[in-house]
Amino acid sequence: MALGACTSAPATGEGVLVEAENFAAKGGWNVDQQFTFEMGSPYLIAHGMGRPVGDASTEVTIPAAGQYHVYVRTYNWTSPWSDKSGPGAFTISVGGSDLDATLGCEGSQWEWQYAGAADLPKGTAKITLHDRTGFDGRCDAVWLTPDKNAVPPAGGEALTEFRDKVNPRKIRKVEYDFVVVGGGVAGMCASVAAARQGVKVALINDRPIWGGCNSSETRVHLGGHIEMEPYTNLGNMIKEFGPLRGGNAQPAEFYEDDKKRAFLEAESDNLDLYPSYRVEKVDCRDGHINAVYATHIETGETVEFRAPIFSDCTGDGTVGYLAGADYSMGRESRAEYNEPSAPEQGDSLTMGASVQWYSVEDDAPSSFPLFEYGLNFNDQSCERVTMGEWTWETGMNRDQCEEFERIRDYGLMVVYSNWSYLKNRLKDNDKYRNRSLGWVAYIAGKRESRRLLGDHVLTENDLINEVVYPDASFTTTWSIDLHYPDPKNSEHFPGEEFKSICTHGAVNPYAVPYRCLYSRNIDNLFMAGRDISVTHIGLGTVRVMRTTGMMGEVVGMAAGLCTEHKALPRQIYTDHLDELKALMSKGMGKSGLKNNQLYNLGGNWPTYRKPKN
């Protein structure tokens, strides 16, 4: 049965549950999977930047003729800031009947909203979602039931159990030598480095596009140096797929998604790709991961991945978190690691997430709907700009995992609200009259959340004192770049800032210990990316993507040694460190390639001094 579950006959009181992300024709609606741990599922979002998007539709099997009551799970996304009817309005038609209810613009949480009733014959019925505004209306699922009182659970475990009962999942099982979760730059490099050593690798990514924040979905350019002492061949592989042009919030072609995909597909003898699969569950016992379970964000297929070793390249430390790995989040107190720049008291402050955007020049004056949902812009508080990149940053005072939908939504809201003010309220707006929004990210670029703890935690003291460790590996070259709410923005939006400033602590290039790249209490878990074993301050230098790519390359090398010796990550440090050093000296990239990664290098530092052996 296609795209929707046919359950038993209506006389039983059961119905038909249709997951919106399963819709066969999505029209202009997009699949958004970023918040499944918060609200339970991927969903469809009508991200039209104020212009209604095309209809999404699918066909479902109706088990028996009769009247069906239609419920839609949706969310009024501006409700945290405004009591007004929200902007994300849409309607639904079922079996050719346009139902009267306007959905998605009332309430204050994810909930089942009643759309109306439709008389349906036995057989096939078409369901269509009609966006009315282009302002990010969202649909999680549609429930057709002969019993008007049979409303599914609102959320949580009860809703998950309901879904699994109505639409049971079949689990496909696969086995590999090495499973990498997260298809950003770190995960790409980890998987390819391992595959080039003959390791059978699975690479899982929860988006259809590879590259993470450097993809055309988020549009953050690469940063940091490659080819640095003590291992000057580390990072060569980034020259194989790294975009040739820099810049944040640029047109999609700048980010060369096809080149990234080709880089991965070239390793198909040893590397299997699983785009659009999101890890939701981990089987971990006695500090050892046996399997991870990933579900396709559109079809709902679940795959069990078994392997001796895994790498968490998710950014959020999702695999480690689900496995029970030790982790940190927020700022450590000064006493914890004796870092001179740490606050006296630790807190939950993190760097935020960016919803980047730009506008384009039109041939004639263009309009934009009035968008006013709780943010009171005026001539002093508005941002008189035609684009927004990294400084547009939200959620620094909120939990970047548990509250991320609100954080992303606030990023959308400030873009729309500010643009609305420039177009509709600002008197001297000649600069904006002939401009319209050309791109607004709905996949937010996150900088910081969980940091999984390894046998070594990189601290500010390591960096400023240039402490040399025997397992020195990839070299970080960026300054200690930390973000904080912009004081000017705080004057107008205290506690709800959406602009940031940064501080740059100058450090020399520093070779980070390998022991930062595996978990201290999950014995077969590597990590690469912004979720490695560092303090909040340490994260400030290692988090840029050329640097995370080199982390991944080292992890892939270590995974090859684990496979060869039937070893665990810690044993590479204790028993096989010389072999790892030999691999790092050689690198896993193709030799002889010109360095085409010379933009956004960052780092104001003296001449690098090679560490003494």
Predicted segments with their positions:
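Extracytoplasmic
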Residues: 10-171
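Flavin (FAD/FMN)-binding glycine-rich loop and adjacent Rossmann-like elements that form
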Residues: 168-172, 213, 275-276, 288-291, ...
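Beta1/beta-strand and adjacent pyrophosphate-binding region of the FAD-binding site
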Residues: 172-184
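N-terminal Rossmann-fold NAD(P) dinucleotide-binding loop
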Residues: 187
